[in-house]
Amino acid sequence: MSILNMQDLELQGKRVLIREDLNVPVSDGVVTSDARLRASLPTIKLALEKGAAVMVMSHLGRPTEGEFNAEFSMQPVVNYLAKALDCPVRLASEYLDGVDVAVGEVVVFENVRFNVGEKKNDEALAKKMAALCDVYVMDAFGTAHRAQASTHGVGLHAPIACAGPLLAGELAALGKALDNPARPMVAIVGGSKVSTKLTVLESLSTKVDQLVVGGGIANTFVAAAGHNVGKSLYEADLIDEAKRLVAAAQSGGGDIPVPTDVVVAGEFSPTATATLKDVSAVSDTDMIFDIGPDSAEALAEIIKNAGTVVWNGPVGVFEFDQFGEGTKRIAQAIADSNAFSIAGGGDTLAAVDKYDIADKVSYISTGGGAFLEFLEGKELPAVAMLESRAQ
């Protein structure tokens, strides 16, 4: 993969427009989770150190296109960056027809989704954005799977288009895990539905030595193995698909292990009583909410011996502590493992935070949908654009 890197470019006196993923939760005008903002700071600081006049743009939330809505304004992000950066930071509400920006200053554009045509990758809008800069920097891995005006179109028309350090680092880490992984390679795919992760499971089943399924996804595989899953969330219409995936994994020398013990309850609630059962003893009224300790230990042993671990999705309803022990044990096993580990996806990152293992994971991916599409082997439009511009 050949793309230009911002680190390698001369930026002194240049107008540099950086597309970051600053889509953070905001409550009462204050940013409530700053992980994405912290991840973007090194790129912005590097551009400043290189002597650039810096412009930053992002979307925030899902406003109606073409309408200003204070609830989705970038102002709280500007307030955060003003404290985090040792330079002037200001918001530009009107910028498409030109914006004044000085070297050593950061101008944050108002929410790109306030512009009509952003999501449809409107060419006229993209050209206006491109005309604002000498160098366009795509640094938002979290939106790299979307071909939109601020992530794709602008890069086609800017004088120079390159990847920022965050995007470049993300691609390098994912490439290391998927293109030439240290073996054995283990992938843990959780989540509620097989249907939403089917292409990921198909793609990974042929690449990995061990594919571990968790959450509602695992229930479909439990049912496919001939066990009763009671009232658990599962997809009866995908049982044959689950059987096919297991057969495909086994024919390649791998496997998709099914839990031998599970934690069940009669209802989905924070106060539900957790009961441990053998997987063959699940009753018609039970709902499976976690894997049991024997299954968790077996998976921990697999992780302990792995060379590479890709984690996307918890193995139980860890938001409720009585159904969190399986995910907690998996998290601890990843933390203790010498494997190169990558964690990605919103629920996964929440588990990483809850069990305090962030500093023990080799790489934490900032992308949700983009992370999944990369695992599926799909081409990310923003990356394809950068490759074409590097020719």
From Swiss-Prot:
Presence of keyword Ribonucleoprotein: no
Coiled-coil regions, chain positions: none
Positions with a binding annotation for substrate: D21, L22, N23, R36, H59, L60, G61, R62, R113, R146
Catalyses which reaction(s): (2R)-3-phosphoglycerate + ATP = (2R)-3-phospho-glyceroyl phosphate + ADP
Organism: Shewanella piezotolerans (strain WP3 / JCM 13877)
Name this protein carries in UniProt: Phosphoglycerate kinase
GO biological process assignments: gluconeogenesis; glycolytic process
Pathway: Carbohydrate degradation; glycolysis; pyruvate from D-glyceraldehyde 3-phosphate: step 2/5
Chief localisation class: cytoplasm
One Pfam family recorded for the sequence: PGK
InterPro entries: Phosphoglycerate_kinase (IPR001576), Phosphoglycerate_kinase_CS (IPR015911), Phosphoglycerate_kinase_N (IPR015824), Phosphoglycerate_kinase_sf (IPR036043)
PROSITE patterns the record matches: PGLYCERATE_KINASE
Record-level GO cellular component terms: cytosol
Protein family per UniProt: Belongs to the phosphoglycerate kinase family.
Complex formation: Monomer.
